[in-house]
Design a protein with these regions (language model features):
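Ubiquitin-like/PB1-type beta-grasp interaction modules and other compact soluble beta-rich domains
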Residues: 1-71
């Protein structure tokens, strides 16, 4: 499976990475392993569809993680 990070989440991490899939892997577990606080997440997409941290990932999935975006 693949994990893509966007904007500030890339700082000190990566842009795109192949992730070793394991049975029962969730979006929330990947957030934990990357030390990304769920409160800082704006959008989570799996295969271009909105998802939640408890979503169980599949072997060929692509997870995209976007931070909250502020401005004004």
């Amino acid at each position: 499976m693949k994990v893509k990070l966007f904007a500030s989440f890339r700082d000190g991490r990566f842009i795109e990475k192949e992730w070793v899939y394991s049975e029962g892997l969730t979006v929330g577990r990947i957030l934990e392993e990357l030390a990304i606080d769920k409160k800082e997440v704006g959008v989570l997409l799996v295969n271009s569809r909105l998802t939640e941290p408890d979503y169980k990932l599949g072997e060929g999935d692509t997870l995209s993680i976007f931070p909250l975006i502020g401005g004004g």
